[in-house]
Amino acid sequence: MNGGLGEWAPPPQVSGEAEEGWVPRDGGERSGGEWGARNVLGGPLMPCSFDPLTGWLRDGSCNTDARDVGLHTVCAVMTAAFLAFSKSRGNDLVTPRPQWGFPGLKPDDRWCLCAARWQEAFEAGCAPRVVLAATHAAALSVCRLEDLKAHAIDLA
């Protein structure tokens, strides 16, 4: 489905129950019927965006599972510069794809990016701002916390 650095693809078909043997990447415990996903600061994972609806599971959060080979875990605030950068790398996030329910993104939209795409943009000097409380802890397997903090909109 999505083996690249974040090319947009329709979400996986997900039932209301976790698949047999499915474990969240951060090893969260089930509590109150929800997985205890954590953000990069160690707190509970907060929503990223419901409009447009984002997330690997299209649940508004940057949660992940074993099928998410792109690791869509960084809650980023889109900028024109980043959207142009992404398109130049073959990932057009601007053009609507109604057949997949994708509205196309514009500056100031929040979106769960692939951690490797954010890191690539960081290294190119055009990384978008991030929402740390909504960025999944699994992003730390690709991105440095110090770099994410330097681009955070939710640190005082």
Give the role of each language-model region.
Residues 6, 17-81, 152-154:
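Extended boundary segments
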Residues 77-92:
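Short, basic/aromatic beta-hairpin or loop at an interaction surface
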Residues 94-101:
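Short alpha-helix capping/helix-loop boundary micro-motifs
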Residues 118-141:
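Short, compositionally biased
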Residues 137-156:
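Glycine- and charge-enriched low-complexity intrinsically disordered segments
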